[in-house]
Amino acid sequence: MTTKDHSLATASFVTAAEHDGLFELPEADRVTPKPAAPKAPVRQGQNKIIPAFGRDAGFRPVPDAVAASASAAHWPGIVLPQLTLAGHRVYPMVAPNAAVWRKRLAAGQEPELDLSTLAYWESWTEDLGPMPPASALTIVGFLSDARPGHALCAIDYLGGLGAGIVVSKARRYPSRNLIWECGFTGAFLVWAPPDRPATLVVSGRTGPVHTARRTPVTRGYEEKLFAWALHTNARPPHPG
């Protein structure tokens, strides 16, 4: 073996050994990198997974039947105007964290939709430095007053984020099949005809499906609904 070949072989061995952890720097010579501070929140214009809505997006007030259905199901929080989420038109219901909500507005911490930033925030711990902004709300669930089949499809698709209410505005009492299907899928069913008070027919699952796990996408939807709440002038109740 030539001197050059020997040098290359030695270099390869040392590199492999370093990768295998055979050679390590003494404790005194190690340098622990200082963690970077959380990124400042910036309103993102686009996100392929959770697309932002336009700043000039229009909205209509929440229908009385939908608001009454949330009350009949004893859901806490604020019903927001209808919004398209993952291709489904629903009325989101959120429970504001009033203290965080007001703190973020006072600090100018706008809703954040960038998933890489949210992944960074969600994994941050107190020992790394000042905590990034907390979520201003919790997703309670979603209401749909669409035709029963479409309503069930929408709230089932969004089941990883929260519960769901099928709002039946028909004059006739809900059918056996609809009652059975809501009971089977864990959806709430509220009958809200135009000439009678809203009535809870099926009490469904509270919260997301039991297999759901919190991810940066979960936080992304919380941030989007925070943005939608601000856009539609929703406010948390004042203390006292």
Where do the language-model regions lie?
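Active-site-adjacent loop/helix micro-motif of nuclease/hydrolase catalytic cores
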Residues: 147-155, 169, 174-177
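Nuclease-adjacent, charged terminal/linker segments that flank catalytic cores
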Residues: 1-102, 111-113, 231-240
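Hydrophobic beta-strand segments of well-ordered beta-sheets in folded domains
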Residues: 140-142, 158-168, 187-188
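Conserved catalytic cores of phosphodiester-cleaving nucleases, focusing on short active-site segments
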Residues: 87-123, 128-130, 135-148, 157
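Generic structural signal of hydrophobic/aromatic residues within well-ordered alpha-helices
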Residues: 66, 70, 121, 221, ...
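Non-catalytic C-terminal interaction segments of nucleic acid-processing enzymes
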Residues: 125-131, 171-172, 179-240
